[in-house]
Swiss-Prot record:
It comes from the Eukaryota. The keyword GTP-binding does not apply. InterPro entries: ERT1_acuK_gluconeogen_tf (IPR050335), PAS_13 (IPR056751), Zn2-C6_fun-type_DNA-bd_sf (IPR036864), Zn2Cys6_DnaBD (IPR001138). The gene is ERT1-1. Residues 81-98 have a biased composition (Low complexity). Transcription factor which regulates nonfermentable carbon utilization. Activator of gluconeogenetic genes. Residues 32-60 bind DNA. It is found in: Nucleus. This is Transcription activator of gluconeogenesis ERT1-1. GO terms for cellular component: nucleus. PROSITE patterns: ZN2_CY6_FUNGAL_2. GO terms for molecular function: DNA-binding transcription factor activity; DNA-binding transcription factor activity, RNA polymerase II-specific; RNA polymerase II transcription regulatory region sequence-specific DNA binding; zinc ion binding.
Amino acid sequence: MSFYPILRGPAKQESPPPPPAPKKRRKTARACLHCQKAHLTCDEGRPCARCIKKNMGDQCVDGKRKQAKYLVGLPPTPPGQATQQKQQQQQQQQQAVQHGMGPPDTDFGSSAANLEYSILSNILGRGDTSSPPDFFPAQSPHMPSPMSIPGLHMEEEGSQTAGTPQGSPTDIYTSITKPYAYTTGFHALIAYLKSRFEKKELLDVVKSMAFYRPSFIATTQTLQYEDLVFMEKCFQRTLLEFEKYISLSGTPTVLWRRTGQIAAVGKEFCVLTMRSQADLLSQFIIECMDNKSVVQYFDVFSELAFEDSRGTITTTFGLTKPSGEVVNTACSLTIKRDVFDIPMMIVGNFLPIL
């Protein structure tokens, strides 16, 4: 029996361990001026390691931050004007405290926006009171009731009347010079709700408002005055096209702003609700609904405004006639947005349920 030798290759040599990875430089919050120009990573030391290596330690200073694009070109606020704005904001807050409201917790950079937000916050925070606080007293010169506001649905000076767009786009672009006063409309809406609903229903409505109203305030804070004027031009231009659609459609149709103010209405809707077109153009859309439908409308709108990307829903609402009779209808709501993706118009199509 023969044995064959087992041939073995040369012993394997263990490979040397890989060199340790170089430590990455830790990014600092602000690079020095030289590293910023060279687009290199800087460290937190001053002078930094790169400037020391290049013998420029005495010139190592923090670089300048770039200004936000929406702030470029804005003139600096004079010190006197800033002080005056601060005093006006403090006066607004003092008046709010006298009317039963505490100072707003959130600063939106605007006293009017802070006051609006405090209205919602205080109504929600007083659910255990016997009645909601009176934010809009009858003698208040700043917040009149809806019925006492002359031309509530009129634009500010330089704009045009809601619901009566000009005959051509050129007229719209030349006649509108000021933005629409949405804050006034919102205050009037709150005053109307307070005069109509009891505490429980009012709290349900305001809870729905609290979901979308702060978003409206926050999204408009970054817009300039020219942007707000452009938004109104977009609204009136869209309204002009829908006027043609309403005149050709046989479906009861009504258009209103995000504050609920009716801007255009078809004759079929006037017949359905037994109201004249002139009366409807001076009302909120919720004035044509029964109490249950009003609460439901604000709940639906809070979902469509920013959460639902489709911006349309089909539901049922009860419309009221001046006699008090309720007409049950199937309704299709569609939200139209402007170029800033902010809801600007709601289109409602109503069909009676027989």
